[in-house]
């Protein structure tokens, strides 16, 4: 069952690329994607190394201790969608959307903890996941805003 879930998220992620890649400015979305992937993978490496949580079933377990599908694909794609929908929003809209985007992913993770062997919490909880997602969404949103501001001629 766990591998079917991973395949489902992989296929949905691949399909969703065709939706976000067509919107302009495409270079911004590519930067957002790779920045979020870097942040998620980097932070998750520490979280796993300090045994706050673990991923017993994951792609390429002999190479990666982190859940690369979510860290390097699902979360970055979700962050691109977040940046696209909050593109013209004010601060309140940006913050509210960051919270709203983090809630479904947190709920999915919580379901995964309770019903699968994809993720096991040791010294971690759903609130920490939600907070991590909101903070990284806002960080990436802020960084891309700075890039836009200082890259204009």
Language-model segments: which ranges?
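Aromatic-rich, lipid-facing transmembrane alpha helices and their immediate juxtamembrane interface loops
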Residues: 1-153
């Amino acid at each position: 069952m766990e591998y079917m879930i991973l395949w489902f998220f992989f296929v949905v992620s691949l399909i969703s690329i065709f939706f976000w890649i067509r919107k302009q400015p495409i270079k911004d979305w590519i930067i957002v994607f790779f920045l979020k992937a870097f942040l998620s993978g980097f932070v998750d490496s520490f979280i796993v190394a300090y045994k706050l949580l673990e991923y017993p079933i994951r792609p390429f377990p002999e190479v990666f201790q982190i859940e690369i599908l979510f860290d390097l694909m699902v979360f970055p794609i979700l962050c691109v969608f977040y940046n696209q929908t909050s593109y013209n929003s004010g601060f309140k809209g940006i913050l509210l959307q960051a919270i709203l985007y983090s809630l479904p992913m947190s709920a999915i993770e919580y379901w995964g903890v309770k019903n699968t062997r994809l993720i096991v919490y040791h010294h971690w909880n759903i609130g920490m996941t939600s907070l991590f997602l909101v903070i990284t969404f806002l960080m990436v949103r802020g960084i891309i805003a700075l890039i836009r501001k200082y890259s204009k001629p």
